[in-house]
Amino acid sequence: MTMLTAVAAARAEVCRLHAALVTAGLVAWTSGNVSARVKGDGDGDPDLMVIKPSGISYDDLTPESMVVCDLDGNRVDGEYQPSSDTASHAYVYRHMPQVGGVVHTHSTYATAWAARGEAIPCVITAMADEFGGEIPVGPFALIGGDEIGRGVVATLTGHRSPAVLMRSHGVFTIGGTANDAVKAAVMCEDAARTVHLARAYGNPPPLPPDQVDALHHRYTTEYGQR
């Protein structure tokens, strides 16, 4: 696949995944974003990223409107300015080479946990499966530069969770692909809602670490079609 073909495919995929955020109820108005890494072709072309344009309605997004940037956050191709979170996405890609996709949302329940500055405890098996433990809280950081990206990397490095609650802001998720990162965002909101409701009726106990390990191992090595 040529770099040109790979970029076109990434634009189509990133556009489709933004629609998935809307379908899942994770975003409102123009907030939130998905990006995908485009691997260099091995002939000297560096990795690129494709990301949502800033301030454009989800109804108006097309593959052609997705913005191509280098991993310093500079626009390489596209009619529009990229998302205000571009520098942070780029920082994640530079410092976490295993990451192929990044997602940011202000989904309601997960952002409520972020506003409290509280990690979501691992009290249900679905969390052990997907996150391998609690969903951690990252530091407060201002929007616009790469400070959020720095917080994401610092929090998730060495952590099994693909999701982080950035304090008083919202959710960032990572994945081997952009689709994986969107899945993590969907599952993060589902876990945040479930644990919030459980807390309304009492104080659910965390799962024992050995059970979390066993559940996460089974999910990541045996679940699904392989």
Predicted regions and their residues:
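Glycine-rich flexible loops
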Residues: 1-226
